[in-house]
From Swiss-Prot:
Pfam families: Vinculin (PF01044)
UniProt keyword Cytoplasm, yes or no: yes
Composition bias, Basic and acidic residues: 865-881
Gene Ontology terms, MF aspect: actin filament binding; beta-catenin binding; cadherin binding; structural molecule activity
Gene3D superfamilies: 6.10.250.2510, Alpha-catenin/vinculin-like (1.20.120.230)
Residues covered by region (Interaction with alpha-actinin): 326-395
Entry protein name: Catenin alpha-1
Length: 907
């Protein structure tokens, strides 16, 4: 490796290296590699007994190689003449290509005259390899000349940054900044071009990050230097200027390293084979390792390896469980899942020992493998929920510590500023810690990179914000100090938003909503207790947390809906968020203010506790409704077992009384009572549910054909199916519906969806010219109306527990059976309606011509089939599947092609 120091430019280049680092060199080299390879492979079966003679094909190919070489020579001459850098090396490389081209021309001609000669073939292969090496070296040299040009511009910017930092007065500072700005812009354009051409994704990311830091921090360095010149006595300004200058130096080094495709100091900061989180990668890897061929199983080899891997995973899980933000119940669940995973591994190893030496895995072994993967999946889910506990708590009212710090600085209270600076620093560290926790359990490789980059920038910004506050505290009347503080405040808030969005991208909205719902429930109960205990501060603080959580839920859900095509689903979700933000939260805020005012007055004024409790309950209900609306399009397979927790949460205060008689029976929900049915009655219900599942599978098969974007009939069918599944789950003592009122509410939702489907169906029928199709569709729509009505009646399931002669008897089975039957009938009607709607739409299209292919809101497009590998992979590999953002085109690797020619030397 040689380093060229021209004008203090550290240019690293190994003249012997043939490593191709950019896509441009690959693209230019590819045609020549293809032509040479084709020529070399001509008649490659070796000597034959056929009549010797001239090969026209070989001559044609040799001529094309010669022409391609001439083209390279023309371009090489032009580059060598125009290049300001590495001129001598480029001229020498062009001459080498010319020399090797002549040798190749001679060897190819001889081979074309006698293509059956192995000696002449060997000579041509060696000449081809030498030619490709020479051309590759020429292209790499030309590429490095471009890099050298970029490094020269980088040096100009680096010197300009130093001059800006060391400016002796404000006039000089202004001149230096004015001169630096266009140079930075010029460098940014050159670096962006280089970034696009880099082959290595890591180098591209490094270049992008460094460019961003440079663009953002040059104006901030100007402001910081200006503040230093105006207030030389304030140490905080000097500290800030030095911090920003250090960041800019790192950015310059980052651009230099990325441009030359060399490793930077921080390249190995985040190991992990998958590029995702360490814990997620370890779990994915463990899931792969547990699949072993019984023939090759050896306890001495596999047991220590698997146990060691698992203990490493459990150590990571334990760290998360012991973190301060992890709830006690979540900690207990993580510990329980860790123990369950340990036990499942021991059971699996025992089964492997029993199957050792066999060709096929036994059913018991397959069952143990399934159990093992289920347990690791359960552990994953609890870890995700633990991370969401942290995210929900930490990314809440993120600007409060900053505002408190700035307020203290404006008052000129340096002692308070130092105290609040510590709080602010802890808050920043918590955000960074939680962001890294979220990364550890995520498989989203690109998302994890973005989170870590954002967290790193936030970490660098934290001391700068504190220094700006200390400077403002020293000169609270200074306009420059206030502007400087505003600048850093804006930068901090922007960076926190970027980090928040990045964390949201790598976490599941389903997990976020489940955890937020539980946290709001906790806070609502705390609010009610604070009200009863007349704790004004506690009430105000907890109510603020509720408002913050609700606002965050609304923001996250609204952002998520931007990813969907507008339709029935998005309307329902946005309707629920609008209800919470426009109606529920204002009422809750009003009640909180009234309560705080009543409790703060002397003497304390009486207030309506029930009104406050109702307003609090509505907040929880609003969050739950949003969550249910978001989950509406999820299939049962996509829903976690814990998406609807089995506990019966009571939002009301401990002293409040339930008024709905049918809601709680002897302290139990109706759903819990249904779960206590005798086995005989459960078997009857199971039989009905199995019949219902058959109809559901028919509906799944029908709707899975169609793309639901722009087709509200398919969206409504999925919604109705989901609600009916919840209702049938209720009859088995499972699912999200707990009480009769929940089932009635679900039936009303189905009726609403049915009426919307009826309206859409009738629109299609009105435009259908075929009377038979029209009559069929209208008949099925009438069935939907009928079965919706039946379902509404059957939804009033009265589950009761009676004590007859000392024996507990659970009633309500007949109602449950009727409910399932009505749901089954409705499901069948929906299937037939979807089919009839499609048929009627096609008749309409044929009669109206291509101009009106689709009716408004009903677009019948076949769903694109899922991409599947040609070779079936193991299920465990599916966790590692990545979605590529662009199609991958296979490029010929010239260096690989060269190495392959070496094998031909022996021919």
């Amino acid at each position: 490796m040689t380093a060229v120091h021209a004008g203090n430019i550290n240019f690293k280049w190994d003249p012997k290296s043939l490593e191709i680092r950019t896509l441009a060199v690959e693209r230019l080299l590819e045609p020549l590699v293809t032509q040479v390879t084709t020529l070399v492979n001509t008649n490659s079966k070796g000597p034959s007994n056929k009549k010797r003679g001239r090969s026209k094909k070989a001559h044609v190919l040799a001529a094309s190689v010669e022409q391609a070489t001439e083209n390279f020579l023309d371009k090489g001459d032009k580059i060598a003449k125009e290049s300001q850098f590495l001129k001598e090396e480029l001229v020498a490389a062009v001459e080498d290509v010319r020399k090797q081209g002549d040798l190749m021309k001679s060897a190819a001609g001889e081979f074309a005259d006698d293509p059956c000669s192995s000696v002449k073939r060997g000579n041509m292969v060696r000449a081809a390899r030498a030619l490709l090496s020479a051309v590759t070296r020429l292209l790499i040299l030309a590429d490095m000349a471009d890099v050298y040009k970029l490094l020269v511009q980088l040096k100009v910017v680096e010197d300009g940054i130093l001059k800006l930092r060391n400016a002796g007065n404000e006039q000089d500072l202004g001149i230096q900044y004015k001169a630096l700005k266009p140079e930075v812009d010029k460098l940014n354009i050159m670096a962006a071009k280089r970034q696009q051409e880099l082959k290595d994704v890591g180098h591209r990311d490094q270049m992008a990050a460094a460019r961003g830091i440079l663009q953002k921090n040059v104006p901030i360095l100007y402001t910081a230097s200006q503040a230093c010149l105006q207030h030389p006595d304030v140490a905080a300004y000097k500290a800030n200027r030095d911090l920003i200058y250090k960041q800019l130096q790192q950015a310059v080094n980052g651009i230099s390293n990325a441009a030359q495709a060399t490793t930077s100091d921080d390249a190995s900061q985040h190991p992990g084979g998958s590029g995702g989180g360490e814990l997620a990668y370890a779990l994915n890897d463990f899931d792969k390792q547990i699949i072993v061929d019984p023939l090759s199983f050896s306890e001495e080899r596999f047991r220590p390896s698997l146990e060691e891997r698992l203990e490493s995973i459990i150590s990571g899980a334990a760290l998360m469980a012991d973190s301060s933000c992890t709830r006690d119940d979540r900690r207990e669940r993580i510990v329980a899942e860790c123990n369950a995973v340990r036990q499942a591994l021991q059971d699996l190893l025992s089964e492997y020992m029993g199957n050792a030496g066999r060709k096929e895995r036994s059913d018991a072994l397959n069952s143990a493998i399934d159990k093992m993967t289920k347990k690791t999946r359960d552990l994953r889910r609890q870890l995700r929920k633990a991370v969401m506990d942290h995210v929900s708590d930490s990314f809440l009212e993120t600007n409060v510590p900053l505002l408190v710090l700035i307020e203290a600085a404006k008052n000129g209270n340096e002692k308070e500023v130092k105290e609040y600076a510590q709080v602010f620093r802890e808050h920043a560290n918590k955000l960074i810690e939680v962001a890294n926790l979220a990364c550890s359990i995520s498989n989203n490789e690109e998302g994890v990179k973005l989170v870590r980059m954002s967290a790193s920038q936030l970490e660098a910004l934290c001391p700068q914000v504190i220094n700006a506050a200390l400077a403002l505290a020293a000169k609270p009347q200074s306009k420059l100090a206030q502007e400087n503080m505003d600048l850093f405040k804006e930068q901090w808030e922007k960076q926190v938003r970027v980090l928040t969005d990045a964390v949201d991208d790598i976490t599941s909205i389903d997990d976020f909503l489940a955890v937020s719902e539980n946290h709001i429930l906790e806070d609502v109960n705390k609010c009610v207790i604070a009200l009863q205990e007349k704790d004004v501060d506690g009430l105000d603080r907890t109510a603020g947390a509720i408002r913050g959580r609700a606002a965050r839920v609304i923001h996250v859900v609204t952002s998520e809906m931007d990813n969907y095509e507008p339709g029935v689903y998005t309307e329902k979700v946005l309707e629920a968020t609008k209800l919470l933000s426009n109606t529920v939260m204002p009422r809750f805020t009003e009640q909180v203010e009234a309560a705080v005012e009543a409790l703060s007055s002397d003497p304390a004024q009486p207030m309506d506790e029930n009104e406050f409790i109702d307003a609090s309950r509505l907040v929880y209900d609003g969050i739950r409704d949003i969550r249910k609306a978001v989950l509406m399009i999820r299939t049962p397979e996509e829903l976690d077992d814990s998406d609807f927790e089995t506990e019966d949460f009571d939002v009301r205060s401990r002293t409040s009384v339930q008024t709905e008689d049918d809601q709680l029976i002897a302290g139990q929900s109706a759903r819990a009572i249904m779960a206590q049915l005798p086995q005989e009655q459960k078997a009857k219900i199971a039989e009905q549910v199995a019949s219902f599942q058959e109809e559901k599978s028919k509906l799944d098969a029908e709707v899975s054909k169609w793309d639901d974007s722009g087709n509200d009939i398919i969206v409504l069918a999925k919604q109705m199916c989901m609600i009916m599944m919840e209702m049938t789950d209720f009859t088995r003592g499972k699912g999200p519906l707990k009480n009769t009122s929940d089932v009635i509410s679900a039936a009303k939702k189905i009726a609403e969806a049915g009426s919307r489907m009826d309206k859409l169906g009738r629109t299609i029928a009105d435009h259908c010219p075929d009377s038979a199709c029209k009559q069929d569709l209208l008949a099925y729509l009438q069935r939907i109306a009928l079965y919706c009505h039946q379902l509404n009646i059957c939804s009033k399931v009265k589950a009761e527990v009676q004590n007859l002669g000392g024996e507990l008897v659970v009633s309500g089975v007949d109602s449950a059976m009727s409910l399932i039957q009505a749901a089954k009938n409705l499901m069948n009607a929906v299937v037939q309606t979807v089919k009839a709607s499609y048929v009627a739409s096609t008749k309409y299209q044929k009669s109206q011509g291509m101009a009106s292919l689709n009716l408004p809101a009903v677009s019948w497009k076949m769903k694109a089939p899922e991409k599947k590998p040609l070779v079936k992979r193991e299920k465990q590999d599916e966790t590692q599947t990545k979605i590529k953002r662009a199609s991958q085109k296979k490029h010929v690797n010239p260096v690989q092609a060269l190495s392959e020619f070496k094998a031909m030397d022996s021919i």
